[in-house]
Curated annotation (Swiss-Prot):
Lineage: Bacteria, Pseudomonadati, Pseudomonadota, Gammaproteobacteria, Oceanospirillales
GO MF, one annotated term: ATP hydrolysis activity
Keyword Translocase: yes
Name the UniProt record assigns to this protein: ATP synthase subunit beta
Primary location recorded for the protein, binned into one broad class: membrane
InterPro entries, A to Z: AAA+_ATPase, ATP-synt_VA_C, ATP_synth_F1_bsu, ATPase_a/bsu_AS, ATPase_alpha/beta_chains, ATPase_F1/V1/A1_a/bsu_N, ATPase_F1/V1/A1_a/bsu_N_sf, ATPase_F1/V1/A1_a/bsu_nucl-bd
EC number: 7.1.2.2
Record organism: Hahella chejuensis (strain KCTC 2396)
This protein's record includes keyword Translocase: yes
Length: 459
């Protein structure tokens, strides 16, 4: 083991000098004297000096402290022992339940599977959320992004997806909390415990209050655990909340590493950093990783470099809209903005495709008519347009749904709606079968039968 000493500390970035013949490799993990702090090598500056990022607080460190090179990247526990446990970026348990007791550790930096080993899946993953199953269906082994500004419901939607899929899917899940609120991590843990699925979930947290090094690497820690399950031939779910914070952590240390900022102050290596992470989240011929990633959209601007870079890696994008949330329609998913590569008649079948496109056509026409209605009122519309407006308003309300994880807020029990019922309900509205029902009957219900029952009660 070679050793060096700290020569400079600027925030989370630390320069360490080693003898010239024993300079550590990039991504090697270094241990500071006392063993409490781990550093990861980012750059070799020449003259035996390496620039590192601290995985933890740099308080109490000073120049001259001895640093040992471990001659290996950061490695974390993998395998079934991680299930039901909460770990930090280095794989240390933070749930006060004692050591993990792992049989194997793996480095967090690995290469993505080769082209020959990758496989794409065409099987649909039913989520039980009407709007998602209808207009932006998920693929098993696909990548999904939940895009939204502050407070439109990304985390609640993710919790509901975990609740529905983890229970129905009965496979293994890995949850990576990247720079999010500790309270949400806490809520998630107890939610899983209550749902009796805690023994199928491994949790890795690098929360908001942690240094940028932790937030930058915690996504890779979670991904490494998911890759191990995949390579054992399992189908894994990987949840990441929030990908934007991963980018932000990179931005925080980028300037300290001496890089010139690029557009909007982001790091110049933004696309590469995102690519390194996303290319590893993939399915192989052995097993699959289905990932759901929450993506914060700064100032509701989808053209911001961070969400824009994420878009290109995803199979399905679920866009949450503030306008829809303002109407009180939850989940506030925009059916016109959300897309999926699976929305193809060859994959989902002709009926599903026709209904989904029909719903989008009616909603788009209603959007166009809104200006006319605002100026001239409903009476000036043709009979055909009046009918479109009426059906669009019913569809809008029918896209809402009570969530299991939001029962405490709404007071109504959550509903899981099968894909068959979803298609039947929307097809009925489009065909005019329910033109006689009041639009309020469609608000916050599960299947169409429930809407019919609700209409009878309100009469």
């Amino acid at each position: 083991m070679s050793s060096g000493q700290i020569v400079q500390i600027i925030g989370a970035v630390i320069d360490v000098e080693f003898p010239r013949d024993t300079v550590p490799k990039v991504y090697d993990a270094l241990k500071v004297e006392g063993g409490a702090t781990t550093l990861e090598v980012q750059q070799q500056l020449g003259d035996g000096i390496v620039r590192t990022i601290a995985m933890g607080s740099t308080e109490g460190l000073r120049r001259g402290l001895q640093v040992e090179n471990t001659n290996a990247p950061i490695s974390v526990p993998v395998g079934t022992q991680t299930l039901g446990r909460i770990m930090d970026v280095l794989g240390n348990p933070i749930d006060e339940k004692g050591p993990i007791g792992e049989e194997e550790r793996m480095p967090i930096h690995r290469t993505a599977p080769g082209y020959a080993d990758q496989s794409s899946s065409r099987d649909l993953l039913e989520t039980g959320i009407k709007v998602i199953d209808l207009v932006c269906p998920f693929a098993k082994g696909g990548k999904v992004g939940l895009f939204g500004g502050a407070g439109v419901g990304k985390t609640v939607n993710m919790m509901e997806l975990i609740n529905n899929i983890a229970k129905e899917h009965s496979g293994l899940s890995v949850f990576a909390g990247v720079g999010e609120r500790t309270r949400e991590g806490n809520d998630f843990y107890y939610e899983m415990e209550e749902s009796k699925v805690l023994d199928k979930v491994a949790m890795v947290y690098g929360q908001m209050n942690e240094p940028p090094g932790n937030r930058l690497r915690v996504a890779l820690t979670g991904l490494t655990m998911a890759e191990k399950f995949r390579d054992e031939g399992r189908d894994v779910l990987l949840f990441v909340d929030n990908i934007y914070r991963y980018t932000l952590a990179g931005t925080e240390v980028s300037a300290l590493l001496g890089r010139m900022p690029s557009a909007v102050g982001y790091q110049p290596t933004l696309a590469e950093e995102m690519g390194v992470l996303q290319e590893r989240i993939t399915s192989t011929k052995v097993g699959s990783i289905t990932s759901v990633q929450a993506v914060y959209v700064p100032a509701d601007d989808l053209t911001d470099p961070s969400p824009a870079t994420t878009f290109s890696h995803l199979d399905a994008t679920v866009v949450l809209s503030r306008d829809i949330a303002a109407k009180g329609i939850y989940p506030a998913i925009d059916p016109l903005d959300s897309t999926s590569r699976q929305l193809d008649p060859l994959v989902i079948g002709q009926e599903h495709y026709d209904v989904a496109r029909g719903v989008q056509t009616v909603l788009q026409r209603y959007k166009e008519l809104k200006d006319i209605i605002a100026i001239l009122g409903m009476d000036e519309l043709s009979e055909e347009d009046k009918q479109i407006v009426s059906r669009a308003r019913k569809i809008e309300r029918f896209l809402s749904q009570p969530f299991h994880v939001a029962e405490v807020f709404t007071g109504s029990p959550g509903k899981y709606v099968s894909l068959k019922d979803t298609i039947r309900g929307f097809k009925g509205i489009l065909d005019g079968e329910f033109d006689h029902l009041p639009e309020q009957a469609f608000y916050m219900v599960g299947g169409i039968d429930e809407a019919v029952e609700k209409a009878k009660k309100t009469k």
